[in-house]
Amino acid sequence: MARKTPIERYRNIGISAHIDAGKTTTTERILFYTGVNHKIGEVHDGAATMDWMEQEQERGITITSAATTCFWKGMELAFPEHRINIIDTPGHVDFTIEVERSMRVLDGACMVYCAVGGVQPQSETVWRQANKYKVPRLAFVNKMDRTGANFYKVYDQMKVRLKANPVPIVLPIGAEENFTGVIDLIKMKAIIWDEASQGMKFNYEDIPADLQAESQKWRENMVEAAAEASEELMNKYLESGELTEAEIKFGIRTRTIAAEIQPMFCGTAFKNKGVQRMLDGVIDFMPSPIDIPPVPGHDDDDKEVVRRAADDEKFAALAFKLMTDPYVGQLTFVRVYSGVLKSGDSVFNPIRGKKERIGRILQMHANQREEIKEILAGDIAACVGLKEVTTGETLCDPDAIITLEKMIFPEPVISQAVEPKTKADQEKMGIALGRLAQEDPSFRVRTDEESGQTIISGMGELHLEIIVDRMKREFGVEANVGKPQVAYRETIRKPVSDIEGKFVRQSGGKGQYGHVVLKIEPQEPGKGFEFVDAIKGGVVPREFIPAVKKGVEDSLPNGVLAGFPVVDVKVTLTFGSYHEVDSNENAFKMAASLGFKDGCRKASPVILEPMMAVEVETPEDYAGNVMGDLSSRRGMVQGMDDMPGGGKAIKAEVPLSEMFGYSTTLRSMSQGRATYTMEFKHYSEAPKNVADAIITSRAK
């Protein structure tokens, strides 16, 4: 099958933003203008096409990134047809993992900001993730029709808060209820949309007289930014003071793809203005799969190899999301980096060393789907029939093995016990939790050995709430949940050496004998566990050393203070002894475990608690109370900024254990006018009185 759209006309973009910036509405409008949706879905009615899980429609927030495909020929139908694959990403901080996953497979991102709220805390998180994967991006300032809308304030905030380099390509005409359209700085014309056609039709008009000087100033700013793309353009600009339309587009595109600048657009998605011009910007300035460097990976021998984005290259793709569909079972969303994949093909998963067959391939449009025979380089689609693959794993041609860089997922910070309401729910709950954990790598399930309870862990209260909700809706499992528990950790503060661990049972017959001497040291935070074998002269035979390591590893999940997992320790095996007959692996495992526990007791063990970065946005009248309350929760207030629409943004670091039920307190303290976001920052040592209370409550 020949390609319908050449690869240079593909755009894989994500749309990401803060919770209420109007991201889903913006995506809806894109689908409407590109002719996919005939009736615009409104989030206000809970009918948006992209938000297709029931909870999303009820809560009006986007949780899973739906992937959808649409086609665009430009506002004036002047472009050849381009194919845009859009990934709608969630804006809630508990779902940061979803954003991270989609950033990984995108070629560009459209950042939506609210013209009133400006650059909010979540916007900073998303920006950091986009920096991490060097994603080219453009900005769309939405909600220009709202009271307090200010395009230029958002421009300033992007520079200050995000250290971004925004370059406006359009300017707003008016603001709030007087917002009527935009000035296109490339064409130097005003664009006025026709309201009756829901913005499908528009007119070019002359720039209003009172905006002439301002437009000229911002046009020069834009042309200058374009000229910096190359020496050639710079020389031309310095000589003639002007560049052609094609040169401006080339310059802005080059620098956007290099992530040096971010073109800026504005409008109001809800009132059908400005999204169309931003879509043209996606085509003009966002990269196609061949504009970005070929994707690197490693082959069987761990040598670096690259795959070009071309159909004649060997097949390589990344599975970036799993979803369970009620009709077809498990869907695996893949981004094809190179080659072609046909339904019925076999693919190899190098991480699991397994070969699997692709059943059907579906092109997704939010919650509708179309079956296709093949997907080509640069495409995003969903495959049916893959059993073993999980998020972040590579799929490749069995004859040309490549492992693409794996995604790294954060450790959960909050846990809850769940138990099924009836015996009949027991088995269903196991299946449901297994499926959900497969879909979402930041969600974990385990069984507590002592109590036999099922423990679920995730990135925040809302995260776990939605998991329990999905169990009920999608799998029909009724469950009771316990109180949220904080995921504490233990570590040590001082190094100890010459710690002996001995396990000896010799009472006639075959005995047990294992003896080790360990040195235990603290590691810097986040370094994890490290084991070093420093045995000289075979005092512990080679074959028993893995058993020593295993003995220590088996002791890590249960620390000596309160049974929490031990982190950031380095254990060195320095000496030991063995018995010709009685030594075996089990004896050395036991000896290492005993030695490690004894060593930890002597190495000043401490309890670590998760600290959260909390940002509260509040009207000024309540700022004092909010700060006082955060301090009473052992919070460290780190600063207070003014917000563009008035009010204060207070940043603080607060232990997670003190934040349960905070939303209720904040609501009553501010009469429902303050909002907050919270994300995990790092672990830090719990003060002695807190640690003592934790240890006492665990001992009960």
Curated annotation (Swiss-Prot):
GO terms for molecular function: GTP binding; GTPase activity; guanosine tetraphosphate binding; translation elongation factor activity. The keyword tRNA processing does not apply. Residues 8-290 form the tr-type G domain. Belongs to the TRAFAC class translation factor GTPase superfamily. Classic translation factor GTPase family. EF-G/EF-2 subfamily. Its main location: cytoplasm. It comes from the Bacteria. Keywords: Cytoplasm, Elongation factor, GTP-binding, Nucleotide-binding, Protein biosynthesis. Gene3D superfamilies: 3.30.230.10, 3.30.70.240, Elongation Factor G (Translational Gtpase), domain 3 (3.30.70.870), P-loop containing nucleotide triphosphate hydrolases (3.40.50.300), Translation factors (2.40.30.10). This is Elongation factor G. The keyword Repeat does not apply. It comes from Methylibium petroleiphilum (strain ATCC BAA-1232 / LMG 22953 / PM1). Catalyzes the GTP-dependent ribosomal translocation step during translation elongation. During this step, the ribosome changes from the pre-translocational (PRE) to the post-translocational (POST) state as the newly formed A-site-bound peptidyl-tRNA and P-site-bound deacylated tRNA move to the P and E sites, respectively. Catalyzes the coordinated movement of the two tRNA molecules, the mRNA and conformational changes in the ribosome. It is found in: Cytoplasm. GTP binds at residues 17-24, 88-92, 142-145. The lineage of its organism: Bacteria, Pseudomonadati, Pseudomonadota, Betaproteobacteria, Burkholderiales. Pfam families: EFG_C, EFG_III, EFG_IV, GTP_EFTU, GTP_EFTU_D2. GO terms for cellular component: cytoplasm. GO terms for biological process: ribosome disassembly. HAMAP family: EF_G_EF_2_B.
